[in-house]
């Protein structure tokens, strides 16, 4: 995407989206309620800024016969999308919209394939700041010649491979030449041509080897199929995304899908682990729960200032990375047990972010050994044989844990995560 108009898109997006909370049951009132809650709950002050309308916002029967524009549903949006955009902008927030790189959206509404220029211009005139662009409704003449391996559970994924893929591309095939890549480039070109900066979020489910071309096409790109508010799905997506961290840096972010914090029957520990992993991976953090009924515990997770500072670091674009798998041998692809030990440098925290995950179904002890953490090895090496420690802060409580030598151990309940800032030597 063009980076010349503004600095927008340098850092991973923060916001809220209708889909995980409401599906198709949306209207202007629900969206403005969410926007006002982003302000009232203090989320705007923490950097959350996008209020995104997902699928089902338009008239389903078709486009305007004379202009060929998509028509906002007048029952859901009496003042149109532009009316909602004006109200959201008045709050100091930004607004997002949804379409698909096909003939219809995933819910069967008019989509943008073949209408990219018209829709980009329409979105710009309405004051849109963000486009989520899905992958539904693709006609046969736009179907790729080959099938790319996205090792989601449901396929017979073996250590990240897809032995059930009957139509793989030949060795050396350039997926930039695929029809999927072309469909997404067409909307990119249309967005760049309008006189408004619109963040471009590709939602192609990891297909067509998007990690090779996503960053030259959009600001973020989905790496998997859809998330659900269940720990097995969250763990599986975290596992898949953990192998893509070398693609993360300023201006380009693999997207493991929107947040489910506050949804379903996730335990508080699972909500914590979900958010901490997504923040540490510098994924877009798009809230997907009803904010007018959110619990204080869930709000506290979404509002964690230390994780958000790491996520929005203006100097270091690289994410945290796994440095030890823990439950499994290193580099094991396991949907039930993603990498458990992560670390990442920060210019704003005064130290290194370290995560320890308990991926097991029972309470377990996890131990971060300082000499194993890549960011700490240089400091330890300079000290020679002298035994030193580091100042450690608990990310969840903000508590100073003092000068911790050699390692830090903690008992973690099932699917919980310990998050630490390991600071200066002591």
Swiss-Prot record:
Keyword Zinc among UniProt keywords: no
Residues that bind substrate: 204-208
Active site: 134 (nucleophile), 226 (proton donor)
Gene Ontology terms: biological process: carbohydrate metabolic process
UniProt-listed InterPro entries: Aldolase_TIM, Glyco_hydro_27, Glyco_hydro_27/36_CS, Glyco_hydro_b, Glycoside_hydrolase_SF, Melibiase_C
Disulfide bonds: 24-56, 106-136
Catalytic activity: Hydrolysis of terminal, non-reducing alpha-D-galactose residues in alpha-D-galactosides, including galactose oligosaccharides, galactomannans and galactolipids
Keywords: Disulfide bond, Glycoprotein, Glycosidase, Hydrolase, Secreted, Signal
Enzyme class of the recorded protein, top EC level: hydrolase
Glycosylated residues, chain numbering: 141, 159, 215, 265
Keyword match Glycoprotein: yes
SUPFAM superfamilies with a match to the protein in the record: (Trans)glycosidases, Glycosyl hydrolase domain
Any one of the GO CC terms: extracellular region
Pfam families: Melibiase_2, Melibiase_C
Signal peptide region: 1-13
GO molecular function, one term: alpha-galactosidase activity
Enzyme Commission identifier(s): 3.2.1.22
UniProt xrefs under PROSITE patterns: ALPHA_GALACTOSIDASE
Assigned protein family: Belongs to the glycosyl hydrolase 27 family.
Its job: Hydrolyzes a variety of simple alpha-D-galactoside as well as more complex molecules such as oligosaccharides and polysaccharides.
Protein known as: Probable alpha-galactosidase B
Gene from which this protein is expressed: aglB
């Amino acid at each position: 995407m063009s980076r010349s108009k503004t600095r927008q898109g340098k850092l991973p997006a923060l916001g809220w989206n209708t889909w995980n909370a409401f599906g198709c049951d949306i209207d202007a009132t629900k969206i403005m309620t969410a926007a006002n809650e982003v302000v009232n709950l203090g989320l705007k002050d923490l950097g959350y800024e996008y209020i995104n309308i997902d699928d089902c916002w338009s008239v389903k029967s078709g486009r305007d016969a004379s202009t060929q524009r998509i028509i906002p549903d007048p029952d859901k949006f009496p003042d149109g999308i532009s009316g909602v955009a004006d109200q959201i902008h008045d709050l100091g927030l930004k607004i997002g919209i949804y379409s698909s790189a096909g003939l219809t959206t995933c819910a069967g509404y008019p989509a943008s394939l073949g209408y990219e220029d018209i829709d980009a211009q329409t979105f710009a005139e309405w004051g849109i700041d963000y486009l989520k662009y899905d992958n539904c409704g693709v006609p046969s003449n736009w179907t790729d010649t080959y099938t790319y391996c996205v090792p989601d559970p449901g396929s017979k994924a073996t250590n990240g491979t897809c032995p059930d893929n009957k139509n793989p591309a030949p060795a050396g095939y350039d997926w930039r030449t695929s029809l999927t890549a072309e469909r997404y480039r067409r909307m990119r070109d249309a967005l760049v041509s309008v006189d408004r900066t619109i963040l471009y979020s590709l939602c192609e489910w990891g297909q067509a080897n998007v990690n090779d071309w996503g960053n030259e096409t959009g600001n973020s790109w989905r790496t998997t199929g859809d998330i659900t508010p269940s720990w097995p799905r969250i763990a599986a997506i975290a596992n898949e995304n953990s192998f893509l961290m070398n693609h993360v840096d300023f201006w380009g972010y693999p997207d493991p899908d929107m947040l489910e914090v506050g949804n379903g029957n996730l335990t508080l520990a699972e909500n914590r682990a979900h958010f901490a992993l997504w923040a540490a991976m510098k994924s877009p953090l798009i809230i997907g729960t009803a904010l007018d009924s959110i619990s204080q515990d869930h709000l506290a997770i979404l509002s964690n200032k230390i994780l958000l500072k790491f996520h929005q670091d203006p100097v270091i674009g690289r994410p945290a990375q796994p440095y030890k798998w823990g439950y499994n041998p290193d580099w094991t692809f396991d949907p039930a047990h993603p990498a458990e030990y992560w670390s990442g440098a920060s210019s704003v925290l005064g130290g290194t972010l370290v995560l320890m995950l308990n991926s097991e179904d029972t309470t377990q002890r996890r131990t971060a050994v300082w000499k194993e953490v890549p960011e700490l090895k240089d400091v330890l090496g300079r000290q020679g044989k002298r035994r030193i420690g580091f100042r450690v802060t608990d990310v969840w409580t903000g508590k100073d844990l003092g000068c911790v030598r050699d390692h830090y151990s903690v008992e973690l309940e099932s699917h919980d995560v310990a998050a630490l800032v390991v600071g200066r030597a002591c």
